A protein has these predicted regions:
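Conserved beta-strand/short-helix segments
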Residues: 1-237
Length: 240
């Protein structure tokens, strides 16, 4: 990043405003969340934008994760408590049937003005998945990676079957989206190579600058292996 734009998430902010630069004094939507964008000009920082979701609601926790492109013109915001059962890009934001499914919102800055560009959901949206707990965008802003640490799929590896397993709750997943000619689409559905119950794969996520490498954290994975490429199937460190 060029260091002149800063985005700060405040996931417990309470305003019911929507969009950019709405009513900051409203406090009627507890824990709806907000993001504040600051810009540095001639060595001085000033707030440039107050950003809310397009479907603000209580307990969505918009701002639970944020990421900026290198030039600061693309902003990704996670809302891990968002409740729509929509899937894919720009689905039904007004649905409220999947509590804590989660969503990601993409905003673009043009001529100093921020506007929402896309509303992003998983291809297998599920209640409680917390999609948007972690987000990362590539340097050019054309790739987006999203973690959903409480997703329940049993697949392993890349683009496996997206079916929930009652025995693999919170195994976790990550999703990669790509922008081409201004249109976003899902490129990959990622699971750990040793998917297991409660691993929280997707609890942290990071794309390299060129988007060719992705790191995914699984903070409750249970192997006692050390170093690189150790025994993934060891389950001796059980979290109780």
């Amino acid at each position: 990043m060029d260091g002149n734009t800063l985005a700060v998430g405040s996931e417990l902010e309470d305003s019911a405003a929507t969009g950019v630069n709405g009513d900051q004094s409203d406090n009627s939507a507890d824990f709806s969340g907000a993001v504040y964008v600051f810009e540095r000009s001639n060595g001085t920082w000033q707030q440039q934008a107050y950003v809310k979701a397009s479907n603000t609601d209580a307990e969505h926790r918009f701002g639970s994760a944020v990421s900026l492109s290198q030039d600061g013109n693309l902003l990704a915001v996670g809302a891990e408590g968002e409740n729509s059962a929509a899937t894919g890009i720009n689905g039904d934001q007004n649905d409220r049937s999947a509590s804590n499914a989660g969503a990601v919102y993409l905003f673009e800055r043009s001529n100093g003005t921020w506007q929402q560009q896309a509303y992003v959901k998983a291809s297998n949206t599920g209640e409680g998945d917390n999609f948007g707990s972690s987000v990362s965008v590539s340097q050019d802003g054309d790739l987006l990676a999203v973690g959903a640490p409480r997703e329940n799929g049993a697949a392993r590896g890349v683009n496996g079957e997206q079916i929930n397993s009652p025995t693999l709750s919170s195994s976790g997943a990550a999703y990669v989206f790509k922008r081409s000619s201004g249109i976003w689409s899902q490129q990959a559905y990622l699971k750990a190579s040793n998917t297991d119950l409660g691993d929280l794969f997707g609890s942290g996520i990071g794309l390299s600058a060129d988007g060719s490498t992705l790191a995914v954290g699984a903070i409750q994975e249970k192997s006692t292996a050390t170093g690189v490429n150790g025994d993934q199937n060891d389950l001796s460190l059980i979290h109780i």
